[in-house]
From Swiss-Prot:
Organism for this UniProt entry: Vespa magnifica
Family stated for the protein in its record: Belongs to the MCD family. Mastoparan subfamily.
Compartment annotation: Secreted
Signal peptide positions on this chain: 1-7
The protein's name: Mastoparan-like peptide 12c
Lineage: Eukaryota, Metazoa, Ecdysozoa, Arthropoda, Hexapoda
An annotated GO BP: killing of cells of another organism
Biological role: Shows mast cell degranulation and antimicrobial activities against the Gram-negative bacteria E.coli ATCC 25922 (MIC=6.0 ug/ml), the Gram-positive bacteria S.aureus ATCC 2592 (MIC=3.0 ug/ml) and the fungus C.albicans ATCC 2002 (MIC=12 ug/ml). Exhibits little hemolytic activity against washed human erythrocytes. Its mast cell degranulation activity may be related to the activation of G-protein coupled receptors in mast cells as well as interaction with other proteins located in cell endosomal membranes in the mast cells.
Amino acid sequence: MSAEALADPKADPLAGPNPDADPEAINLKAIAALAKKLLG
């Protein structure tokens, strides 16, 4: 898990459904995290 995900559990797509979290924001953060992993 990334430091960002640990710092903001609501933004972690692996944390499961969260009524307080915006699904679109979660998707954007997940894509950004994946891009960071792929690009190093």
